[in-house]
Amino acid sequence: MTPSQIIVLATPVFFVLIALELVWGLARGRNTYRLADAVNSIGLGMLSQISAVFTRLLRVGIYTAVYSSVALFPDATFWTSWAGWLLALVFYDFCYYWLHRAGHEVAVFWAAHVVHHQSQDYNLSTALRQTSSGALFGWIFYLPMAVAGVPPLVFGVVALVDLLYQFWVHTEHVGKLGWFDRWFCSPSNHRVHHAVNERYLDRNYGGILVVWDRLFGSFQEEDERCIYGTRKPLNSWDPLWANAEVYATLLRDSWRTRHWGDKLRVWIKPPGWQPADLAAAEPAPPFQLDAVQTFGPPMSRVVQGFGVVQFALLLAGVAAFLWTADRLPLAQAAVWLAVLTASLWALGAVLQGRMGMLEALMIESAALATATSALGMIDLHRIFKPLTMVIAIIFIATYAASARAGGQNGSSTRLGDRWLVLAALLACLAGDVFLMFPGYFIPGLVAFLIGHLFYIAAFRLGVPWLPSRRALGMTLGIGGTMYTVLWFGGLPPALRIPVAAYVVVIALMAAQAIGRAAVLRPGPGGRAAMGVAVGAGFFMLSDSVLALNRFVAPLPMAQFWVLATYYTAQVLIVRNVLIDRNPA
């Protein structure tokens, strides 16, 4: 049985305990759960587990290579005895202590570990909140076990035991436990670890044993109320940003500081350290415990219900993936990783209010359409491909109708604007359907050409025709170059004129979108216009990949890249095209 399968089997136990903690807290008037926070924490755990299918190869592979080369005492008989198992577990916990401590005292390790601390709640769902990048460097701290001769199988088992033990200590409903607190990581000890109080900061690192903290001077007793989270709150339900936030800050500081030594020190100094030049220009504000505010955008009951249903479906999808992941080809596993990641991101965006439910459904349907095409699941593909555009059409219709009912009189709510976009989407829907069947390439090409003409007309509203000559020259140049490649790469003579017409029209569509963004950029609609322009660029990229694969040479995973870029284009256009506050 694989580690992923063990996690799947343990998941029902996790949720039973979470449910019991929730009921207990409600009954005692001390509920420690919030829906969005719990979904976000568990979602980050899902993302951690599905990405571990790939990153685990790094950790286990390096460990096995070192063990095979330099193990000093590789006696399997000893290590699989009760004394060997116990020693290996203590050895692992000792290494974990130093990894965990580095995760708080060295910025690059904190960038990975911070995910576990971002929740401002402390409950059993917080235990499942795990990083997706910890394996990139964490393996370094366990190499002493490989050198000592702990077999990889024993290492894997004790690592899982150490991880599972730490689940139960993430609760506010278990008080101090007397002698147990003096030896082991307990709820009281670990509450201190998660707190941002000054006296609690960077304390109690032990995974199973807290004696390491007592030995190395990092122990702190719980003696005042804990405030949870990080000193620089994430303030987001975005699982991708949760993993990238600190890395982005380190990259920015490393790039902006003038001194070459500081460009390295940024990564190895304690979290929050700033080079002198950056600290002088942009000093970090002092942390004030009494100013901490809990992040929690309001949600309607409909959104809460949507979130619960989506979460349940994603949980089932993640469980199915983890159960079979080790038997899947790497490319196939990567496709499903992309689907689940996109869906987790969309769910977080809905819960935060950054995206509507229809937009999230469009993204999820697009991801499934892409995956089913790439993996040859034709029957399912023929459902999800048209469904994606149907959802987009419904979204545009309802968005425009609600904006109009709300009394907005800007150009984005004009009837013509709505119908032009709807006509473009209907044409794209027809093109999608045609291209699902052999022998209908020309009808599909014509349908998309019509769709681009409607998009051009929609992008024209509120701005001049083709307002940027530079954009026009760029898109026509790219289109002309691609057409030349197709011509010499084997484009059939019967398709040369239709494809030429299509290339010109899509280049004009992209040029109009880019020019529109240039005109609107200084105003409130500039960001949305830029989203439309980027979407138009992805449209050109998608069609280029499709044409190269069809007429020049087969490309690896072509269907995945064609549809991934196509749906990225449609999502960006659909989400942004009606957001334009400039007056008509």
Which residues fall in each region the model found?
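Membrane-embedded catalytic scaffold of the fatty acid hydroxylase/desaturase
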Residues: M46-L58, W79-P233
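Transmembrane alpha-helical segments that form the membrane-embedded catalytic/substrate-channel core
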Residues: F15-V23, V90-E105, L160-G175, S186-V192, ...
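Polytopic alpha-helical membrane-helix bundles and their juxtamembrane interface segments
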Residues: M357-A584
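Substrate-recognition/cap regions that form aromatic- and gly/pro-loop-enriched pockets
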Residues: P297-G356
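Transmembrane helix interruption/hinge and helix-loop junction motifs
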Residues: P3, V147-V157, A325-L328, G376-I378, ...
